[in-house]
């Protein structure tokens, strides 16, 4: 799978320089995505138990427990994975309030979805 917006993860890595466990976990996520051919949500969760579908089977949060880091990724039918958002758990709570309706509104406000 091809990953777009990888720079978002680059910023997260730069912000957390020295946290080698987190950097290793992010690199493993990148490797897992790039070396996968996931077709269904079940395929994703079989390979990554830290995943949670947050909107319509297209947007997923990966919970990197090493540093309570969350990464939202959109998986498209054409085999492309797009990094949408990444941050600490505190950033997640501040932005999304642990609420799926707030996530949906954020996706809409940032032109990731239309409805």
Regions found by a protein language model. Name each.
Residues 1-68, 75-81, 89-115:
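Basic, Lys/Arg-enriched alpha-helical interface segments
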């Amino acid at each position: 799978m091809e990953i777009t917006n990888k720079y978002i993860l680059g910023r997260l890595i730069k912000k957390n320089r020295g946290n080698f466990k987190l950097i290793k976990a992010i690199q493993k996520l990148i490797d897992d995505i790039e070396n996968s051919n996931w077709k269904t949500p079940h395929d994703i969760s079989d390979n990554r138990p830290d995943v949670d579908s947050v909107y319509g089977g297209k947007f997923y949060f990966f919970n990197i427990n090493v540093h309570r880091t969350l990464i939202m990724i959109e998986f498209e039918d054409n085999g492309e994975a797009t990094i949408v958002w990444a941050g600490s758990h505190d950033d997640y709570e501040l932005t999304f309030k642990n609420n799926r309706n707030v996530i949906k509104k954020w996706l809409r406000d940032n032109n990731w979805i239309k409805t």
